[in-house]
């Protein structure tokens, strides 16, 4: 969400950023709606003040037995009621349109973010690790994780497809244990060494939680909802069914006919569906949603910041915009585990906290001795709510390229405004918007893929990184032949 006052003061600056996201003219539209809203509010307030004044004068006129004046004033009050109703309607309309517009507009990038249209505009910041020193680095044609998983008998995409469809997997045996070990290792690292507080949050959230972090309303198609109902499609079906049973209704008694008509009425069905939707939830696409919303509508003391939270949870994504991409294997799944990092801090500390978060994510890859590079994303490749984002990309030998494994973003006060999350400075009464940051520390499934591929040897064994061996009961390798 954006500060309309800031947009009003410098619309060209905002429009310059939004035009690159296909929203040219959005700033001018926001200013126009804001002007309509304020004009309606002024009209309403003036009419209310005039009505109150006239109401007092009516009493005075009646006390003086001046019936003509009292009648004139009463007519004036009645007229003002119409003005107030019109102004209130205009206020509600402009307010709703302005809120909808602001909710649909992405965050403004930080000045140091490079301009660009897509991933080709991202800037590499650094690289770490040497893939040739790992077991897979000695192979001419390293296998991908799908073939490795099949050889180990621990990765079954067909069984998952039979029960859930595409983009799911059943992990078994040593691979399932390795996945669990990776998640526990990451969580211990972030809590014990990096000082994050472990949280076990809800996996189901309401609309307002996803609105707060920016997934709704724009990205509903990428989410899984527990309840779905299309009222428009229902209306068409209702009309067809009502026509078909119309003649049958005439044969019922008046009492039964009226009861049945009500139960079949659009008003009743709409009310019932709305009630169901209000009770519905969404599966979280990332624990960022649950962790960040902990401070929703809260006023936090400055002494409590930075607040660093982490959670190991499943994440659920519909991947609506990913048709045809990464259809093989575990790179892009509807359900996957991830260790999420969230920081709540002050504006003056958010940049330093961002750099720290990136280092916390990088440490996971360093301890696993997985080669990676860190990228600063350009304006066209950043997410909706981010003002600055770093991606970590891990080396996958089967693809001979780096692939994203973590994304760490500073959202500034963008999410805080949507959630009304504030902090209070020492000695002050008022509140200031917090800054929120989030990142993966890391995606467990993609880390599993990277370990399998980078630590395979010519005999088909998977060597277990030293950092994971304590979580695997001391096992040093799985599968294959010595």
Swiss-Prot record:
L-serine binds at residues 286-288, 340, 440. Its EC number is 6.1.1.11. It comes from the Bacteria. InterPro entries: aa-tRNA-synt_IIb (IPR002314), aa-tRNA-synth_II (IPR006195), aa-tRNA-synth_II/BPL/LPL (IPR045864), Ser-tRNA-ligase_type_1 (IPR002317), Ser-tRNA-synth_1_N (IPR015866), SerRS_1_N_sf (IPR042103), SerRS_core (IPR033729), tRNA-bd_arm (IPR010978). ATP binds at residues 317-319, 404-407. GO terms for cellular component: cytoplasm. Coiled coil: none annotated. It is an enzyme of class 6 (ligase). CDD domains: SerRS_core. Residues 1-18 have a biased composition (Basic and acidic residues). Keywords: Aminoacyl-tRNA synthetase, ATP-binding, Cytoplasm, Ligase, Nucleotide-binding, Protein biosynthesis. Belongs to the class-II aminoacyl-tRNA synthetase family. Type-1 seryl-tRNA synthetase subfamily. Consists of two distinct domains, a catalytic core and a N-terminal extension that is involved in tRNA binding. This is Serine--tRNA ligase. It comes from Caulobacter vibrioides (strain NA1000 / CB15N) (Caulobacter crescentus). The lineage of its organism: Bacteria, Pseudomonadati, Pseudomonadota, Alphaproteobacteria, Caulobacterales.
């Amino acid at each position: 969400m954006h500060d309309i006052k800031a947009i009003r003061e410098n619309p060209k600056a905002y429009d310059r950023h939004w035009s690159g996201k296909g929203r040219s003219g959005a700033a001018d539209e926001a200013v126009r709606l804001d002007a309509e809203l304020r004009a309606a509010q002024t009209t309403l307030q003036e009419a209310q003040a005039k009505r109150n004044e006239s109401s007092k004068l009516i009493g005075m006129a009646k006390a003086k037995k001046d019936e003509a004046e009292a009648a004139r004033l009463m007519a004036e009050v009645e007229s003002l009621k119409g003005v107030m109703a019109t102004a209130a309607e205009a206020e509600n309309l402009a307010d709703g349109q302005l809120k909808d517009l602001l909710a649909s507009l992405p965050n403004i990038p930080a000045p140091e973010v490079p301009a660009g249209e897509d991933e080709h505009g991202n800037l590499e910041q650094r690289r770490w690790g040497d893939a040739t020193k790992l077991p897979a680095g000695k192979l001419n044609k390293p296998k991908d994780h799908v073939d490795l998983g099949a050889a180990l008998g621990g990765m079954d995409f067909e069984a998952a497809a039979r029960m859930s469809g595409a983009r799911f997997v059943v992990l078994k045996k040593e691979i399932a244990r390795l996945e669990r070990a990776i998640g526990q290792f990451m969580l211990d690292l972030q809590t014990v060494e990096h000082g994050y507080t472990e949280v076990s949050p809800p996996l189901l959230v309401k609309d307002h939680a996803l609105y707060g972090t920016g997934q709704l309303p724009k990205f509903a198609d990428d989410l899984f909802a527990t309840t779905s109902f299309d009222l428009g499609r229902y209306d068409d079906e209702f009309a067809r069914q009502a026509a078909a049973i119309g003649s049958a209704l005439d044969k019922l008694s008046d009492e039964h006919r009226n009861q049945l008509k009500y139960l079949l009425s659009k008003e009743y069905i709409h009310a019932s569906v709305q009630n169901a939707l209000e009770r519905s939830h969404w599966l979280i696409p990332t624990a960022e949603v649950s962790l960040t919303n902990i401070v929703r509508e809260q006023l936090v003391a400055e002494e409590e910041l930075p607040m660093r939270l982490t959670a190991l949870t499943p994440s659920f994504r519909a991947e609506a915009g990913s048709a045809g991409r990464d259809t093989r294997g575990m790179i892009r799944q509807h359900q996957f585990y991830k260790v999420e990092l969230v920081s709540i801090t002050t504006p003056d500390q958010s940049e330093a906290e961002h750099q720290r978060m990136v280092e916390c994510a990088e440490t996971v890859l360093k301890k696993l001795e997985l080669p990676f590079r860190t990228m600063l994303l350009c304006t066209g490749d950043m997410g909706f709510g981010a003002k600055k984002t770093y991606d970590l990309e891990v080396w996958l030998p089967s693809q001979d390229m780096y692939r994203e494994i973590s994304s760490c973003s500073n959202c500034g006060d963008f999410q805080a405004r949507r959630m009304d999350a504030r902090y209070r400075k020492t000695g002050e009464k008022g509140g200031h918007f917090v800054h929120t940051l989030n990142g993966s520390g890391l995606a467990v499934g993609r880390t599993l893929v990277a370990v399998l591929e980078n630590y395979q040897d010519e005999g088909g064994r998977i060597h277990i990184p030293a950092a994971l061996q304590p979580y695997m009961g001391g096992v040093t390798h799985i599968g294959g032949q010595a």
